[in-house]
Amino acid sequence: MSIGIPGECLNNKHGPCPLCDGTDRFRWDNQDGKGSYICGQCGAGWGMDLAMKFTGKTFPEIASEIDMLLGNKKFEPDQVRPPMSEDDRLSALRAVSAQSVKLTQSTLGHAYFVSRGIGEIAYPKSLRFVPALRDGEGGVRPCVLATVQGPDGENVTLHRTFLRADGLAKADMPSPRKLMPGPIPDGSCVALSDYTGGPLGIAEGIETAMSASRLYDLPVWAAINAGMMEKWNPPEGCDEVAVFGDHDAKFGGQAAAYRLAHRLAVKGLSVTVHIPQIEGHDWNDALLLARPLEEAA
């Protein structure tokens, strides 16, 4: 029995975040032996916070499991919460989806995308908005909902981006971006447009993909994170792909981009890789940096 957090995340060095899948912004510094951590995306917290967020379990459940790990209590399998059943998983997805409305210019979701320089006149059907959704951390917040589709084009789960009350930024919480529980097939993504032929781009995050689409004037889909991006496959009939990687200090985003590019190129596809010039930037950063230059021109 173990909590399940990978050991390479717990070495007091910058590396992958077990919560948000960032590749080099997490560090477990274990101050005063309390398991403290900090992540550029998720924020900071203590060891119990990390364990609860990683497992989705409550404080008493985690405390009980740690007691068992330390030998303070005998491990009884029936004391551990069983994994969510498929019926429960689908019910949870339907319940969240039922609360959503079309993402339009009158919603706080639009205000959020405008704040990121990527407001649209009309948003893709894969993006919707929930005015008030439970965030899994004791709060209720506005939320942008994204449908994640599998490599066969079938919907597999939902991705949630929780927003501030005014919609002008992500919510001030440890994990404002969350996938719904359950397995996600390799190659899944958020299709931010219908594929009608021609070149197609792929990026990590939703905002990153929308920004790359603005800058390069082509459709770009979102793979959610670097790990999912390198496993992505383009839709049938697509033989030209532009890969938009993040410029990570430890090269995680670049590595994922080039691994994907290599795999697709070996299959005979025409592939280009694009990385922002500035270290630490993704394509939304690049877009926001370019906007003042465009306005001054």
Regions found by a protein language model. Give the residues of each.
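N-terminal structured subdomain of primase-like DNA metabolism proteins
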Residues: 1-75, 120, 237-239, 265, ...
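Short, basic/aromatic recognition patches
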Residues: 119-139
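Conserved active-site segments centered on acidic
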Residues: 61-103, 155
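Alpha-helical elements of the RecA-like P-loop NTPase motor core of helicases
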Residues: 49, 111, 210
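Compact soluble domain cores
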Residues: 105-122
